[in-house]
Amino acid sequence: MMKKRIQFFFGSIALLGMSACSNSYVKPDAPIKEVPFTQVHLNDNFWTPRIETNRTVSIPSAFKECEKNGRFDNFAIAGGLMKGEHRGDFSFDDTDPYKIIEGASYSLAVKYDKALDAYLDSVITLIAAAQEPDGYLTTCVTNKCYRLSGWWGKSRWEKINSHELYNSGHLYEAAVAHYRATGKRSLLDVAIKNADLVCQVFGPGEGQKHVPSGHPIVEMALAKLYKVTGDGKYLKMAKYFVEETGRGTDGHRLSEYSQDHKPILQQDEIVGHAVRAGYLYSGVADVAALTQDTAY
């Protein structure tokens, strides 16, 4: 009996990592459906206090670090709301606020917090202001931070490993989580506008860029965006990035470090950077489930 209780308990914990679904999907999900973690309630003496500490201490602390280290200022500068020099050492610093918004949204889905909800609104206002008219959103590029040109080059989408699509992926993840938790479209609309641009720039067509994502996550994020919006082009784009992996169509080829050493259907061993691998293969699983493509 004890063994069964332990198995059930850890199974319940595992569900917390799955998508929040406060709002219904527009499209039917894959044949295998996750249980929304909002349907799992913990009332124990171990996890419950830690989840509360996450809400009251960890999330506010993480946002304060963003304030202190200029993460929000970079969006404000890009949006013309303030003057100043771009701060930070990496082209993917924009993802720090996105990741925290995602986590904070999961927290809101479990326990509503009026102050946190309002704070997210203020941060999202900065992010929306930084988005360029055509949907582009990577602050170090918009702010022309050539100090970081080793990452991104001199213009948009110049380098496959620029992390621009990585930034987009985390934006979509945050936007979907926020929409599901609050029903607000403020960040979702930013994500959709960016994703529409990505679908124009990348793909198999003439004049498009025929490259993989460089640093995976946009694959699984596009799959989530598809499930929320019902727009099939996002799933198609996710599948394109998965299948362009390892092909080197435009002469771009990364290494095993980026799981770009061979086409995805030829890969039979997990190699390279663990985070990249986790994101890529999760995206492959999402695409396989949603398309029911048995080749995967």
What are these regions (language model features)?
Residues 2-10:
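Bacterial N-terminal signal peptides that target proteins for export
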Residues 11-15:
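Hydrophobic helical h-region of N-terminal Sec-dependent signal peptides
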Residues 19-20:
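C-terminal motif of bacterial Sec signal peptides marking the signal peptidase cleavage site
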Residues 25-296:
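Glycan-recognition and catalytic cores of secretory/periplasmic carbohydrate-active enzymes
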